Curated annotation (Swiss-Prot):
Quaternary data: Component of the ClpX-ClpP complex. Forms a hexameric ring that, in the presence of ATP, binds to fourteen ClpP subunits assembled into a disk-like structure with a central cavity, resembling the structure of eukaryotic proteasomes.
Domain ClpX-type ZB span(s) in chain numbering: 3-56
Keywords for this protein: ATP-binding, Chaperone, Metal-binding, Nucleotide-binding, Zinc
Name of this chain's protein: ATP-dependent Clp protease ATP-binding subunit ClpX
Species: Cupriavidus taiwanensis (strain DSM 17343 / BCRC 17206 / CCUG 44338 / CIP 107171 / LMG 19424 / R1)
Amino acid sequence: MADKKGSSSEKLLYCSFCGKSQHEVKKLIAGPSVFICDECIDLCNEIIRDEATASEKDAAAAARSDLPTPHEIRESLDQYVIGQEQAKKILAVAVYNHYKRLKHLGKKDDVELSKSNILLIGPTGSGKTLLAQTLARLLNVPFVIADATTLTEAGYVGEDVENIIQKLLQNCNYEVEKAQRGIVYIDEIDKISRKSDNPSITRDVSGEGVQQALLKLIEGTMASVPPQGGRKHPNQDFLQVDTTNILFICGGAFDGLEKVIMQRSDKTGIGFAAQVKSKEERDVSEVLPQTEPEDLIKFGLIPELIGRLPVVATLAKLDEAALMQILVEPKNALVKQYQKLLAMEGVELEIRPGALSAIARKAIRRKTGARGLRSILEQSLMDVMYDLPNYKGVQKVVIDENTINGDAPPLLMYEEQQPKVAGSN
């Protein structure tokens, strides 16, 4: 019992937990057949606070362990993307900070962390799209690629910018929560630049108009998307997707941007400190890293959009050595893919170093970068892949420089027989 008889007729009350009487404590709170004093309440609150702090620390540690560090992100990118070291470092830090920020959301704090979307600038075939794809695969988040050239303002013929979010939803089976933490890669962003750096008087539905529409999406808005796809109509219930926490990566070749940068640097470089290098001597890969917001405005992007893409990474033009590495080194290297295809026929594929060099040189001449490597190799192997299922006893196919240049067909090596040229009887 929490009450005891004293010497007088007065009934003394005691704390059911520590046993102190009502005279020894400041306050005694009554419950059904029990009492608790203010000291025991303070002690309970202290225990709860300590346990809550410990669980918060454990949760934060678990959240950090789930998220790869910038070094781990960079290492994963290295497995698929050759070169572009500075761009990979910039992307690794930006993506790490973005998802760290998402884990911080919901906590009461004076400092509000804003989103840092990314702009990738680099020539065709330098790895912009592959970098974005690899990041999404590593982080296991929904990912979509959109082509800026197909977009128009709402109400005009073409794709509405909100179609991008619809595709993102489709890629995660219409799970809105997942979509709101996804990555959107908008390619060819340079192709929707306005025609001059002055605000347009006439309507530009596929240039400045699209930039304005994208601006709302990128900075964060509630996008209305028809459920399970389909066209919008007035009497329809829409899915509401908040784009505030979606990471937007915009990419483009920005052909001619180097001229804008050189014009600016030539003006600021007059005098004894001016660089002596001529415009012809300055490589595009040297110039693009000097990109400033004013250059992008001059090129035709609106200032508001540039402001929403604070992280800028430039990718260098791939040289012959880098293209040769791309052919053989990444996890999904092109040579490995074709070796796997021929291995399914029980045939070994050997591509000699001279052939790799010839493929790289051909891609450079075509100005297609890494993107053009597959078509060159496919063209060289086309006849072999067509005839191989009908051949018997072929052990190895050899591709050399002459095959790539179109001077000779691939060499077929038969079991315990002399080499034979493909297509000969």
